[in-house]
A protein has these predicted regions:
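OB-fold/S1-family single-stranded nucleic acid-binding modules
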Residues: 98-127
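Short aromatic-glycine-enriched beta-strand elements
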Residues: 45-56
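Conserved hydrophobic positions within beta-strands
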Residues: 37-39
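Short, structured beta-strand/loop micro-motifs enriched in basic residues and often containing a Trp
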Residues: 68-77
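Short nucleic-acid-contacting surface segments enriched for D/E, G, S/T with interspersed K/R
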Residues: 77-92
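Bacterial N-terminal signal peptides
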Residues: 3-16
Length: 128
């Protein structure tokens, strides 16, 4: 009986505890920041995928933004294949900016502008 109780505890309670560090408190989730630029790096890794986007600032200087996303499995569940975005692709994003005003965002939505309809050109997909 004790083993059964521990098994139930492990299956029900522990997965909820392990998800606790996935908070979005460091982002301004009540508003979106819109960016357009060129993908410089793509890292589809656990526990968070990352895209590094080169964007032109107000003085026409290139600035790199770090865009945090969900896991590779989470992206697949959202219909995003690994080749949806590649290095060198032009994209538009809507993201939640980091509260400390660094060039970092929680990536909400991404629209590829690479011209390849096979890879979803012009189709906005959710990344979180």
């Amino acid at each position: 009986l004790a083993k059964s109780i521990m098994l139930v505890f492990g299956l029900i309670v522990l997965p909820n505890i392990s998800d606790g560090h996935h908070s979005h408190v460091n982002y301004v989730v009540s508003e979106f920041t819109q960016l357009e630029g060129v993908v410089r790096e793509v890292h589809l890794i656990n526990p968070h995928s990352w895209i590094y986007l080169e964007v032109q600032d107000g003085q026409d200087e290139p600035v790199i933004w770090a865009l945090e996303s969900t896991t590779p499995d989470g992206l697949l569940r959202n219909g995003i294949q690994p080749d949806f975005v590649r290095i060198g692709d032009r994209v538009q994003v809507r993201c939640h900016r980091q509260r400390d005003n660094h060039n970092a965002c929680l990536l909400g939505f991404l629209t590829p502008l690479h011209g390849d309809s096979e890879r979803g050109h012009g189709i906005e997909k959710e990344w979180d």
